[in-house]
Amino acid sequence: FSDAGCLTSVLVTTKSGDAREFAHLYANDYDVVACAGGDGTYNEMIDGVISSGAKCKVGYIPAGSTNDFGASIGLSKNIIEAAKAIANGETITLDVGSFNGQYFSYVASFGAFTSASYSVPQNLKNIFGHTAYVLQGIKDIVSIKSQHVKVITDEGLPTERVIEEDLVFGAVCNATSVGGVLKLDSFRV
């Protein structure tokens, strides 16, 4: 960023929630807020920026163990190239959703296998990468239960739709894959 003439501040996350907190506290002070990390770090940053009311742009340098979201929107897997794209002002427009009071632009999900991303220790992610999530998912198979859910889309609009069912897994998604495992039809996303 410095090579491109950008004045930068660097904050290092040490625990879950830090990216959300930092983005919420400081987004109004910057033209661009960017993170280097995985899909979870990016999701936290989005929630923090949107909940702060800031109008800044956001950037994502995919540097985590899966980087599913970055891949699905065509970001470079090379962190230097991804950083250059941000510094050069390259942008794409993305939708942001709200799910139970939290903002997201990748996926909000519930049910089977969704706890894996939170329960895998960081050191195992560092050692095994994406495989750590798969192994946790296999471990979680024995505890899968359905949940009764009610989903309201376009609430208050003429196109409002209510879906109420018992589901094992559900997701609201803005990408062509979930967790690097479930691939979706790009025309339906």
Where in the sequence are the language-model features?
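Catalytic core of DAGKc-family lipid kinases
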Residues: A4, L11-T13, S51-V172
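Short, solvent-exposed amphipathic alpha-helical segments in soluble enzyme
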Residues: L25, I50-S51, P121-Q122, S186-R188
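Short Gly/Thr/Asp-enriched flexible loops that form oxyanion-binding sites at enzyme active sites
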Residues: T41-G53
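Short amphipathic alpha-helical segments
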Residues: I46-V49, A71-I73, K183-L184
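Phosphate- and divalent-cation-binding pockets in alpha/beta enzyme and binding domains
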Residues: D18-E21, E44-M45, D68-F69, S115
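Internal anion-binding site segments
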Residues: D166-V189
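ATP/NTP phosphate-donor binding region
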Residues: F1-V33, N43
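Active-site acidic Asp-centered loop
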Residues: A36-G37
